[in-house]
Amino acid sequence: MVGDDVREVLIKIVIFAGLSYLGLSLLAYFVQHRLTYFPDTSRIVPEAAGLRGVAEWVVETPDRERLVLWRADAKPGQPTILYFHGNAAGLANRAPRVAFFQSQGWGAVIMAYRGYAGSSGSPS
């Protein structure tokens, strides 16, 4: 009958949609690291990014990874900003922000996450 044919087609559509959803969910789970982090691995010194009076430091972590950070001193009586750059780009892309902090007399410490801007390791 026609009703049975429609029912059979609807069941196949629901099964296909469910399996497609499951497959896409599994794919997203297994590649989520690549969908979340977009590390810019290039290491640029502050001067090459147009910054003056900014020192580059390399800090070794207890698990022997190296983290690159930039440090600009504050003028007397002014605050120092601890700035984390987010999950895209690297330190050089934040140079205008550091320059703004300096123009206000503020200090800045900006660290490259693992896997970004010359820091070793990988983000997690």
Region locations from a protein language model:
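Feature targets compositionally biased, intrinsically disordered low-complexity regions
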Residues: 2, 49-52, 76
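Compositionally biased, intrinsically disordered low-complexity regions
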Residues: 5, 52-55, 109, 123
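Membrane-embedded segments
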Residues: 61-124
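N-terminal Lys/Arg-rich, disordered targeting/topogenic segments
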Residues: 1-7
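An N-terminal hydrophobic leader/cap segment in hydrolases
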Residues: 13-60
